[in-house]
Swiss-Prot record:
Keywords: Chaperone, Cytoplasm. The gene is groES. This is Co-chaperonin GroES. It comes from Methylobacillus flagellatus (strain ATCC 51484 / DSM 6875 / VKM B-1610 / KT). Heptamer of 7 subunits arranged in a ring. Interacts with the chaperonin GroEL. SUPFAM superfamilies: GroES-like. Belongs to the GroES chaperonin family. GO terms for molecular function: ATP binding; metal ion binding; protein folding chaperone; protein-folding chaperone binding; unfolded protein binding. The lineage of its organism: Bacteria, Pseudomonadati, Pseudomonadota, Betaproteobacteria, Nitrosomonadales. Together with the chaperonin GroEL, plays an essential role in assisting protein folding. The GroEL-GroES system forms a nano-cage that allows encapsulation of the non-native substrate proteins and provides a physical environment optimized to promote and accelerate protein folding. GroES binds to the apical surface of the GroEL ring, thereby capping the opening of the GroEL channel.
Length: 96
């Protein structure tokens, strides 16, 4: 099953965070916070303006993005959890 976002929605796969502290202590899944960074895996066509024309999104597939801790809706696609976010929920693009 594939998912195609509508309007200004973006599908993001969370990036895995390190499960150890700097001193080597392993953090269990139950205590670890969900990461607030992810990779964009799909983008919608954009919001429609008053004339019905789509306004393209600033993010594109492959971008690494930052988002709020409680942003978006988590869904499972092919057994993998992804987030459905509005472009407004994205705080910024991480540049290497």
């Amino acid at each position: 099953m594939a998912i195609r976002p509508l309007q200004d929605r973006v599908i993001v796969k969370r990036l895995e965070e390190e499960r150890k502290t700097a001193s080597g202590i392993v953090i269990p899944d139950t205590a670890a916070e969900k990461p607030d960074q992810g990779e964009v895996i799909a983008v919608g066509p954009g919001k429609k303006d008053d004339n019905g024309k789509s306004i393209p999104l600033d993010v594109k597939v492959g971008d690494k993005v930052l988002f709020g801790k409680y942003a978006g809706q988590a869904v499972k696609v092919n057994g993998e959890e992804v987030l459905v976010l509005r472009e407004d929920d994205i705080l910024g693009i991480v540049e290497a």
